[in-house]
């Protein structure tokens, strides 16, 4: 524990007094301060000027990060017949129908993304209370209810990230690993911020992108200049 304490103190000292950094500065600081014995995820938190309790202020979407996430994504697909075969051929980890529904109902959720063909939604719909809170419910708006299951599986495994605003108006996501080159992390951050910016809902009033912070899994966060985080 003493070593962990020293590393934590050192990281906090490195971050002390540093606010509103450029994306490049923030990424460099996070990479230099990362000290865990595993490849930490670089995480982004965005405070948005929305109240997601109102339907016209909900923010959700999907973005393909140019350099991937560095994470192995486990994909489940609800499909039958030829579409099930397509999903398996594309690399889906779990493929099923009612049998997969029963597995999930039993509490066994061993996947990070869930995809379904439209005809399977009556089955998937019974899992709303389980999949919904985990942001795993297939949704046509983010391309996870589709007949092109092969492409959806490839997208999920190729660095596509879904995002959805939480009750407090915050969006969290992983945008890479600390082992990534700085330039690749910067590209990923800007791609993610731009996707959220483009998903601005009609009901949003005032400042939309309010605050942005970056951190590593085990490290403290640092605030990032909003203008710097935009690729535009």
Swiss-Prot record:
Question: Which Pfam families does the entry mention?
Answer: Ribosomal_L1 (PF00687)
- What's a BP term from Gene Ontology annotated to this protein? translation
Is Nucleus among the key words of this record? no
Query: Is Transmembrane helix one of the keywords?
Result: no
Top-level lineage group:
Bacteria
Q: Which UniProt keywords apply?
A: Repressor, Ribonucleoprotein, Ribosomal protein, RNA-binding, rRNA-binding, Translation regulation, tRNA-binding
The UniProt entry's GO CC annotations, sorted and at most eight, read: cytosolic large ribosomal subunit
GO molecular function ontology, one term from the record: rRNA binding
Q: Which SUPFAM superfamilies match?
A: Ribosomal protein L1
What's the subunit arrangement here? Part of the 50S ribosomal subunit.
User: What exactly does this protein do?
Assistant: Binds directly to 23S rRNA. The L1 stalk is quite mobile in the ribosome, and is involved in E site tRNA release. Protein L1 is also a translational repressor protein, it controls the translation of the L11 operon by binding to its mRNA.
The entry's family comment says:
Belongs to the universal ribosomal protein uL1 family.
Q: What is this protein called?
A: Large ribosomal subunit protein uL1
What organism, scientifically named, is this protein from? Ruegeria pomeroyi (strain ATCC 700808 / DSM 15171 / DSS-3)
């Amino acid at each position: 524990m003493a070593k962990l304490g020293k590393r934590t103190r050192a990281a906090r000292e490195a971050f002390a007094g540093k606010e509103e950094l450029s994306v490049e500065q923030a990424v460099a600081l996070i990479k230099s301060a990362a000290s865990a014995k595993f490849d930490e995820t670089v995480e982004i938190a965005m405070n948005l000027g929305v109240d997601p309790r109102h339907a016209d202020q909900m923010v959700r979407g999907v973005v393909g990060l140019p350099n991937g996430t560095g994470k192995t994504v486990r994909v489940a697909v609800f499909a039958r017949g030829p579409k099930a075969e397509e999903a398996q051929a594309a690399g889906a980890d779990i493929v099923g129908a009612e049998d997969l529904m029963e597995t999930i109902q039993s509490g066994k959720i061993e996947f990070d993304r869930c995809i379904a063909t439209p005809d399977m939604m009556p089955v998937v719909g019974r899992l709303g209370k389980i999949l919904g809170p985990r942001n795993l419910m297939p949704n046509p708006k983010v391309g996870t209810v589709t007949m092109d299951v092969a492409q959806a599986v490839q997208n999920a495994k190729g660095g596509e990230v879904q995002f959805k605003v939480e009750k407090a108006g915050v969006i969290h996501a992983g945008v890479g690993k600390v082992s990534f080159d700085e330039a690749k992390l910067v590209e990923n951050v800007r791609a993610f911020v731009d996707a959220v910016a483009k998903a601005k809902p009609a009901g949003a009033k005032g400042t939309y992108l309010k605050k942005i912070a970056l951190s590593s899994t085990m490290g403290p966060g640092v605030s990032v200049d909003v203008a710097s985080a935009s690729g535009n």
